[in-house]
């Protein structure tokens, strides 16, 4: 439904240790180059793909859902790998970002996993209110600015996450 409405690509993701795992995908053909005339995103992530949690919007949403003590255990002694020049690798900065995600209840991450790409994520909660997954949309910076993502896609992501809630 989200893809039909927006022509964007969406994923559902879960936390597995220090990584996030894509467990569902919906979207356009992501293998086409981002530089192509169609503007379709070259973001070749597939079902089962694993990414470091600290570099993704989904990972940050899922880390923000952890109790503080559990997040501290997750972070303690961890090397935060750099994937781009924009990747946060400092534990204090990551902690600050996670606090902001907790306050906002969503995360927008720009160019931390891949240059020219940003992603917006929201938590997916079960009926007990526990975050069990994150739902995201990924787009090229040039085609879909952050303000547009927040204005147009954030309400759709929140609505979709709320629709999923009774099913999990």
How would you describe each model-predicted region?
Residues 104, 131-168:
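Juxtadomain coupling helices with adjacent low-complexity linkers
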Residues 25-27, 112, 136:
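Short clusters of small/polar residues that mark proteolytic maturation junctions
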Residues 1-77:
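Amphipathic alpha-helical effector-binding/dimerization core
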Residues 6, 16, 102, 131-133:
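Residues at helix C-cap/C′ positions in short coil/turn segments immediately following an alpha-helix
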